[in-house]
């Protein structure tokens, strides 16, 4: 094993290092732990030799090239503010705020006044409409008008009321019996009363004639 040489290459402008084992054979057998330790030492020595002397902006680690970010950051200079400018701006802002307050209040007052006027106008219109409808209802009752179709009413409510009253009167006309039906009804009752009177007092009230029976009728002359 001492005849072979181990070579380690690193990409870039790095010199190749050749490491050979010691000529004098070490007594005993090299263990695996000792072998790994020797490899670690070899790699660390190669990395130390690979580092450049001057500070460049690139770092070379194994097979990757990393770019070093620039550490020079321009410090932010605080803005220079004069005390007089601060005082003047503060006074101006105060004056502007003081002057702007009554303008906002006046605009709010104008809006409130406009809303109040619009509410009053809308309420007045509603009251006028209600009074006109109320006057039409009171001045034109449907019970005293014979033909409501000839009249022209401003509101639809009066028309609906007139239609309802017409339908109600028609229903009442249909319910009321005719004269012939009333005569038939009372004729039957009169016949019953006449029959009972004739049986009790033996007198015919229709023909004004006395009948034979328990009572004796005498004609009285004036």
Swiss-Prot record:
Binds and inhibits CYCD2-1/CDKA-1 complex kinase activity. May target specifically CDKA-1. GO terms for molecular function: cyclin-dependent protein serine/threonine kinase inhibitor activity. Residues 68-101 are annotated as: Disordered. Disulfide bonds: none annotated. This is Cyclin-dependent kinase inhibitor 3. The lineage of its organism: Eukaryota, Viridiplantae, Streptophyta, Embryophyta, Tracheophyta. It holds the Pfam family CDI. Residues 85-95 have a biased composition (Basic and acidic residues). It comes from Arabidopsis thaliana (Mouse-ear cress). The keyword Nucleus applies. Keywords: Cell cycle, Nucleus, Protein kinase inhibitor.
């Amino acid at each position: 094993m001492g005849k072979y040489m181990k070579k380690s290459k690193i990409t870039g402008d790095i010199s190749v290092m050749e490491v050979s084992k010691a000529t004098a054979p070490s007594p005993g057998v090299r263990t695996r732990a000792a072998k790994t330790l020797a490899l670690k030492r070899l790699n660390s020595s190669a990395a130390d030799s690979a580092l450049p002397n001057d500070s460049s902006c690139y770092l070379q680690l194994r097979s990757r090239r990393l770019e070093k970010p620039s550490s020079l950051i321009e410090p932010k200079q605080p803005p220079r503010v004069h005390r007089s400018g601060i005082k003047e701006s503060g006074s101006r802002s105060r004056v502007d705020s003081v002057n702007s307050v009554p303008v906002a209040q006046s605009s709010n007052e104008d809006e409130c006044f406009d809303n109040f006027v619009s509410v009053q106008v809308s309420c007045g219109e509603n009251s006028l409409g209600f009074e006109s409808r109320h006057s039409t209802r009171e001045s034109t009752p449907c019970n005293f008008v014979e033909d409501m179709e000839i009249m022209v009413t401003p509101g639809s409510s009066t028309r609906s009321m007139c239609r309802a009253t017409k339908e109600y009167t028609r229903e009442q006309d249909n319910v009321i019996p005719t004269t012939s039906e009333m005569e038939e009804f009372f004729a039957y009752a009169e016949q019953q009363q006449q029959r009972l009177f004739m049986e009790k007092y033996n007198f015919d009230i229709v023909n004004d004639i006395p009948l034979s029976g328990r009572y004796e009728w005498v004609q009285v002359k004036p």
